[in-house]
Design a protein with these regions (language model features):
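Membrane helical hairpin/interfacial module
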Residues: 9-41
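Short, small-residue-biased leader/transition segments that mark boundaries at the very start
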Residues: 1-5
Length: 324
């Protein structure tokens, strides 16, 4: 989301976002950050059931609040630092971050180092299964990689070397332990074989070159097992509710980004146009889409899905200097 704001040059919105993110970091206890807050930084969002409501099409229970506040989702540290890094590099900002903010971010980075190879609920907030998720490990790597770059910008060579060393060690382990030789793909978790669409983020965050044969074969395998036409499911393993039946819309946009990066732009554009066609009359997308009926499911409208539209449009658009 932060990259979407950055790339669209929404500077005022970006400054507000960075200010909110700074408050999260400053308020963190020993570097730990819970995966979600209330808009006013509320930490307690207890989940309860409304027993007298049947739920959508009788598919209860109806929940109030979100238990995910209690989860350990280790990708959060990389996401925080990826978002906050903009404050150190972007000369459009009225108030750029400096050494004080960097020291606060380093606490978050140390937490990323501690949890890098520890099981968690993953970005999908799984309630009954913990693994060392590849996507979480990737974000721990991103935390260290961006801290090294921030330190270089601040002319702190010792800290740059420190964080670059952590990043390189993590990268070696991720590429080794998440690779499944049988499937010729990066798997959902260390030592696993199940596929998960979130590994498509490897190219976007920069841990692998999109032209790396391993990444290209991963895209091929993900398309084989998770895609129904333009739609893409999150993962193939059963979750808390069984095997997923609906496609998760942001995954289709991750696929579009990956295809464009590896040179399959024509296919990426066709998928993008298919996703635009299932929006409602106001141009909005839900969280999920049923791959057979095209019916919208899940939270509506869904920020992730709308960010996917924006990022996809920018990825597929020609540069002005190529058309003028």
């Amino acid at each position: 989301r932060q990259m979407c704001i950055r790339d669209r040059s929404e500077v005022a919105t970006m400054e507000d976002y960075l200010r909110w993110m700074s408050n999260v970091v400053i308020d963190s206890q020993g570097g730990h950050i819970q995966p979600l807050f209330g808009i006013g930084l509320e930490k307690s969002l207890p989940e309860s059931f409304v027993d007298n409501l049947p739920g959508y099409r009788g598919m209860g229970p109806v929940r109030v609040g979100n238990q995910a506040q209690e989860h350990f989702q280790h990708d959060v540290y990389g996401n925080v630092i990826l978002g906050a890094a903009q404050a150190f590099h972007d000369h459009r900002l009225l108030h750029r971050a400096g050494a004080r903010e960097f020291r606060a971010l380093e606490r978050v980075g140390e937490q990323a180092v501690r949890v890098f190879d520890q099981p968690d609920a993953g970005m999908w907030e799984l309630r009954t299964r913990a693994r060392i998720h590849t996507s979480s490990a990737i974000m721990s790597w991103a935390a260290c990689d961006r801290l090294a770059k921030i330190a270089a910008t601040l002319k702190l060579p010792d800290r740059a070397d420190y964080w670059a060393g952590h990043a390189e060690g993590m990268r070696e382990r991720i590429l080794k332990e998440s690779w499944n030789e049988e499937r010729q793909a990066f798997a959902e978790s260390f030592g696993g074989r199940d596929m998960d669409a979130s590994v498509l983020l490897m190219a976007e965050v920069g841990i692998v070159d999109p032209k790396d044969p391993r990444f290209i074969s991963t895209v091929d395998e993900l398309e084989r097992v998770l895609c129904d036409g333009p739609y893409m499911r999150r993962y193939e393993a059963p979750d808390d509710f069984g095997r997923p039946e609906t496609a998760f819309n942001i995954c289709a946009f991750w696929r579009i980004d990956a295809l464009a990066r590896i040179g399959r732009k024509k296919e990426a554009r066709a998928i993008f146009e298919a996703m635009l066609a299932v929006r409602n009359p106001l141009g909005l997308l839900s969280e999920d889409t049923h791959p057979v009926t095209g019916e919208m499911w899940g939270n509506f409208p869904q920020t992730y899905s709308m960010v996917g539209i924006i990022n996809g449009a920018m990825r597929l658009s020609a540069r002005w200097d190529s058309v003028i």
